[in-house]
């Protein structure tokens, strides 16, 4: 069953990409909430195909995450290319986690994408 769903998801993403309806969702968040995102993806059946970059440093609207002696925390970054409906579910998950952990620094950016 999983293989059929994966093939269907891949086909839908490819169709969306060729029609210019593919979305790029970028999530940047404190490493402390990584498990919340990964569990949320799994439970909601979203974000099955993603790129994850660990040890991301930066400063946004919460405390800096620089991985040094002064600001020792680090961020994670996840990039997902998906159809609009899946992007909306990822946004909902990010908002839910942000509400649960308002001081952790969780950013979500969505843009149009296309397969070339």
Language model regions located:
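Positively charged, small/polar-rich N-terminal and surface patches that mediate targeting and assembly
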Residues: 1-116
